A protein has these predicted regions:
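Primary mode marks residue(s) on the alpha4-beta5-alpha5 output face of response regulator receiver
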Residues: 24-230
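Positively charged n-region of N-terminal signal peptides that target proteins for export
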Residues: 1-4
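Boundary at the C-terminal end of the N-terminal hydrophobic targeting segment
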Residues: 18-24
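Bacterial N-terminal signal peptides
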Residues: 6-17
């Protein structure tokens, strides 16, 4: 297990900057990011355990952004993030994932995160679909947060990313199921400095900012698979 994780970490460090940097710097046609409706609903439902997804709202990506395909009743929202929705803006080596239409990152925001965090990801998507560059998206998000048009983050909230079918980027693939803790202003030193890609909790996104994300890997046996026939 340790050897496998070490190999994965080496791949993340060695492959990701080159592979991501090699991505084109213009957006492919939006149709390359879109999925068939039923396939996207099924994939979104693999983001979390059925106890969450069976009662969650499901959103799908369309040419006009994310729209509700199924209205739930537990406050959670599940969807499939794309390259222009999912990547962090620090470390900067991942910014060009916005141009990669192969990224599929199923996620289920729990009710508090759906209220406070989801609008941030939807804004990033909107800005990308308007043709904004990664730097322009980052600036737009920061401006919206400063202006109060994005919800202020006062506490920690959570999302599931348990899909066995996620593709998080070149050299990363499905990695392993994990939860995302949206923890404003955390940095990795506060968690013990655990290395990127390790099985320990780590701050992977936007450390020291209101948008900081802690990734907590979970048992790979918990990965949620598509039902037969999909």
């Amino acid at each position: 297990m340790i050897a496998r994780l070490t190999t994965l970490l080496a791949a993340l460090i060695a492959v990701s900057p080159a592979a991501v940097g090699a991505q084109q710097s213009t957006y492919p046609p939006i149709d390359r990011y879109l999925m068939p409706r039923d396939a996207e609903i099924a994939l979104a439902r693999t983001a979390a355990p059925p106890s969450i997804t069976e009662h969650a709202t499901i959103k799908l990506l369309t040419r006009s952004g994310y729209v509700v395909a199924h209205q739930g009743d537990n406050g959670s929202v599940c969807m499939v993030m794309r390259g222009f929705t999912a990547p962090t803006y620090t470390p900067a080596m991942f910014r060009d994932l916005v141009y990669d239409p192969t990224v599929h990152a199923p996620i289920c925001f729990t009710a508090p995160a759906a209220k406070v965090v989801l609008p941030y990801y939807e804004l990033r998507t909107t800005l990308a679909m308007e043709g904004k560059s990664p730097d322009q998206i980052a600036a737009g998000v920061q401006a919206a947060y400063a202006a109060g048009t994005l919800p202020h983050r006062d506490g920690v909230s959570m999302a599931y990313m348990w899909s066995a079918h996620q593709h998080l980027g070149p050299g990363i693939g499905a990695w392993r199921p994990h939860v995302m803790l949206f923890a404003p202003n955390y940095d990795n030193a506060m968690l013990g400095g655990n290395p990127f890609g390790s099985p320990m909790p780590q701050v992977t996104d936007d450390a020291g900012t209101p948008f900081a994300v802690i990734v907590v890997p979970v048992d790979p046996a918990l990965a949620v698979h598509l039902p037969a026939g999909h």
